[in-house]
């Protein structure tokens, strides 16, 4: 939905190009995720483990790619994730597509850059403990990123936020957003941990029927354990609207 709402922020001169393609932009925003298991270099484009580089605001990390490579080496950087740099490369590709008037690439890169920008706004995409695997909180990544919006976004979140503004220094902008995500990661984890003390497991989790995916039989439903509605609402409230705020900012 991020790409969908982003279209409506565009000036009229761009809206005439993007609005007729709004479904393409929405549907193909997930293409980078689909590539993660087929393209070895895809995974690091979605995250950066900022805690690997010390503490906020991580002054040791060069913001420019060539300087970062000179300091850490390309292999080391890719191991820890490269999302802030990859977004800038995607922006260059998109700019070149506009210059050459290659409309198919304009749509492809527009759809995909929206995905990477959204990832950069997710706190656990800027933290090595990306799914709570180090703190016995496995599943928290999908909880913050999917479960909370799934239950609350359509009815409670406001995604109409005025008109788009030109960003003069996109490199600085995306790094600031990544640093915000890294700073918020501990809150995402600690809030879930604190709230879990107030909920027994039978209240924290619920079993729900979901449509089967991928290798399962088409149309088949499967029962999965999911964070309960009550726990999800309480978590969102305790976070002070962080999920909505980060989603709005990613638009």
Language model region names:
Residues 1-108, 112, 126-249:
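N-terminal, motif-rich segments that launch catalysis or mediate targeting to/interaction with membranes
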Residues 115:
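Divalent metal-coordination and catalytic microenvironments
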Residues 118, 124:
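Short active-site segment of divalent metal-dependent hydrolases/proteases
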């Amino acid at each position: 939905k991020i790409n969908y709402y982003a279209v409506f922020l565009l000036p009229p001169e761009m809206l005439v190009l993007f609005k007729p393609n709004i479904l393409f932009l929405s549907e193909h925003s997930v293409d980078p995720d689909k590539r993660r298991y087929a393209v070895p270099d895809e995974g690091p484009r979605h995250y950066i483990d900022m805690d690997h580089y010390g503490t906020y605001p991580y002054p040791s990390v060069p913001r420019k790619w060539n300087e970062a490579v000179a300091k850490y080496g390309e292999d080391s950087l890719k191991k820890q994730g490269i999302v802030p740099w990859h977004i800038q490369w995607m922006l260059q590709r998109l700019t070149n597509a506009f210059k050459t008037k290659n409309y198919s690439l304009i749509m492809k890169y527009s759809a995909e850059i929206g995905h990477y920008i959204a990832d950069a706004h997710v706190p656990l995409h800027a933290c090595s403990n990306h799914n709570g695997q180090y703190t016995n909180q496995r599943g928290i990544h999908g909880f913050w990123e999917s479960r909370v919006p799934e239950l609350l976004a359509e009815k409670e979140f406001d995604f109409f936020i005025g008109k788009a503004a030109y960003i003069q220094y996109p490199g600085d902008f995306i790094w600031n957003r990544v640093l915000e995500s890294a700073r918020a990661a501990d809150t995402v984890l600690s809030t879930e941990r604190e709230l879990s003390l107030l909920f027994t497991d039978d209240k924290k989790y619920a079993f729900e029927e979901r449509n089967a995916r991928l290798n399962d039989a088409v149309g088949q439903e499967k029962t999965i354990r999911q964070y309960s509605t009550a726990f999800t609402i309480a978590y969102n409230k305790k976070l002070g609207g962080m999920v909505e705020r980060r989603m709005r900012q990613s638009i």
